[in-house]
Amino acid sequence: PHDVGGYFDFSPGDEAQRVRSDITRALLALRIHVEMAHHEVAVGQHEIDFRYEQALHAADNCVTFKYTVKGIAAKHGLIATFMPKPVFGINGSGMHVHQSLMDTKTGATRMYDPSGMFNLSAPARQFVAGQLVHARALAAVVAPTVNSYKRLTPGYEAPVYICWAQRNRSALVRVPRHSPGRESNTRVELRFPDPSCNPYL
């Protein structure tokens, strides 16, 4: 790893911050809307979140993102890896996918229900249930390598339990807290995909 920083670490002269800034500028030039870029928990680990899109466009953005990161890292004399668990004994890298359901005719969210558990609608809860029921089969697609399973171990904020929760990062599906007035942002986070997966599947 190129640094020993921690979560949201930032210090003057931070080479990693310069690289993240270059990556962010390049992604914006490629019309990928970056929402956040910061150091993650593990040494040499970084997170760059980009804005939601329709599924196919999001998959395109994911592939473009990887090529961009690798190219800019190389220009800085670094090697970027998207391995789920490149270093034993520290947190691995996931590719958490935030998902929402929209009405195809109106574009309105189908996720929100003020009377539902965690403010989730019945279709949203059924959507989550389907992913939990089929989690083992989905793992072949979203965690497709031997290294994927080195990440999915207890103690490293990895999703190791087939369940859903609001605050427990060990859950396969997390439900971000509801923000009043932002009902259209209601979503669920599928936490067990990792960067080695094919985003088109």
Model-derived regions, located:
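Glycine-rich, acidic/polar active-site loops that bind/position phosphate-bearing ligands
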Residues: 1-201
